Amino acid sequence: MRRVMFLLLCLGTINLYAQVPELDPTSVVDIPYTDLQVCDRVAMKASTDYDALSDVEFALLCFVEENPVLSHFYSGNCSWYCGGQIDSVTASSALADRYAAEKAHDFSIVTAWVEGVEGNGVGEYLRYSFPGTCPRITTVLIHNGYVKNWDVWRDNGRVKKLLMYYNDEPYAILNLQDTMGLQSFDVGVLGYEDKDSAPAWSIKFEILEVYPGKKYEDTAITEIYFDGIDVH
């Protein structure tokens, strides 16, 4: 009887996933070959004491602000986040405090969320919670794996498939490429147009499959962030 119940559960899960659309990236933009930790330090210095930048630091900052990937993290350019609000980012587990859920949404390309269970992290998830007044989301952007440098990225696991939930209902499967680059997914329109009495809402990302790391079983995600409408 137990075996029959297990088979029925498996069949139900397969049928559920079969009804969920699969999405491939609409674009993948490579990370430029540069020292990302130096970029991080220069951007931090610019935010606190811009006039103290050296000529070399200023040149690096200009490069960063013009780069289609790095500008998301280190420039003051307008984006969905001019109006976008996130109440919390939580996770089912984390390897340690320095790999906590919020590291997947801290706008730093040298930190990451790393799941904390035994094995490769299949079934672990990140959940993003939004107030009802939040502008609507149309795009999910992902840096897959621990991208701060090549060795760390290669040694740790990366996500192959993410099951995306909207308000705890399966919404789409995101097929991620095995790359350090920025992957963009068009996900329709999420959130509420009429925000006066709109309830809070959420997006969850559950690991379905992974690309194994060369050295560790741990699976990492550097950033998941968003673009959308209803701003400016």
Regions found by a protein language model. Give the residues of each.
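A short, local hydrophobic-aromatic micro-motif
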Residues: 87, 138-139, 201, 222
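Extended extracellular/luminal ectodomain segments enriched in beta-structured repeat modules
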Residues: 121-123, 132-141, 200
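Exposed beta-strand and adjacent loop surfaces of beta-rich binding modules
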Residues: 86, 137, 159-161
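Boundary at the C-terminal end of the N-terminal hydrophobic targeting segment
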Residues: 16-18
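Sec-dependent N-terminal signal peptides
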Residues: 4-14
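Disordered, acidic Ser/Thr/Pro-rich linker "stalks" and the adjacent N-terminal cap
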Residues: 20-129, 154, 230-232
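Trp- and acidic/polar-enriched beta-sheet ligand-binding modules for extracellular glycan
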Residues: 20-45, 49-55, 120-123, 146, ...
